[in-house]
Amino acid sequence: MRICILGATGLVGSELLTLIARAWPTAELALYASRDQTLAHGGDTHEVQAASSLERGDAPGGDLAFVALDDQYSARYCPRLVELGYRVIDKSNTYRMNPEVPLVVAGVNHHRATSATKLVANPNCTTIPLTLALEPLRARFGLGEITVSSYQAISGAGLAPLSRFVDMTVEGFTRMQTAGELWGELLDPAEYPGNVVPHSGKTDDSGFSSEERKLVNESRKILELPELGISAQCCRVPVPAGHYENVWIELERGADAEEISEALASGPFVHYHPGADGAGLTALATVHRRDHALVGRLRKDNRDTDGRRWCLTVAADNLRLGAATNAVRIASAWFPASDPLLGIPSLRQA
């Protein structure tokens, strides 16, 4: 089995390498990035080729390709990989809303990745945990309206912003300790350290950001509810990793807390934490490198009169579940994974 990763030197590429070693430990790897280089990962050194080499007439084919590139490069290389015989899972926004390309969350609509499918779009890092939490509620009670506020880590913006964030944070605290300067005096309001940015991504003419549009449109497509009433406010917060979402839900049919808790706990790749205090959801270490969504803080909305309006919190590692883990689970529909935790429900042993 030959597996290709485009964008192997990035944050998602690194997580893919870790998971591939668990899922397909004997696979041959073909790694690509913007230029020829070497990559140290997990105690091994890998040769990385320039992605442009795939455009040569003698470029080798393979079985499975993960593409973790910006939109313009995904549009350039995904068709070429399909042409070379790969089944392709693309992390960019390029194909997500294309009606001819399935947008898949393992545990929600993985049936869309069939034996005939050659290209699958991997959803945005906030959409994946949100739809994992919503799907068991949709199945049992129906969904009316959804309102989401997300708090998204710096790593969701990419390696360069994360590196700058770490450098500026260390520099700021060092200056505080050595020069006695106040943290607030050191901050650039245009930079991430110490600031909560009230949008994530570029805003359009309506004022909504690209992250907010993705969350709304992708959720409708994945849940197969094109008319779902859903609105989102996405913020960037000064933490390195981990996305949090506070979700207000209106169900079509009323239910009590026990019924909703049972539904959430039954969801594939969901770890449900009972109790309204959010215990188990607050620490960064709780979500770091976890391959599931954490759901908790379930409580009835204070305007509820019939058991239809509820609030809850969803947390996940944006680089793992929100990107690499979902991609690997999708691929397990075609190539069964050695690690059962990286399979999808219809293929996993009970």
Predicted regions and their residues:
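N-terminal Rossmann-like NAD(P) cofactor-binding subdomain of oxidoreductases
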Residues: 1-192, 229, 293-294, 298-306, ...
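Charged docking surfaces used in two-component/phosphorelay signaling
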Residues: 65, 154-350
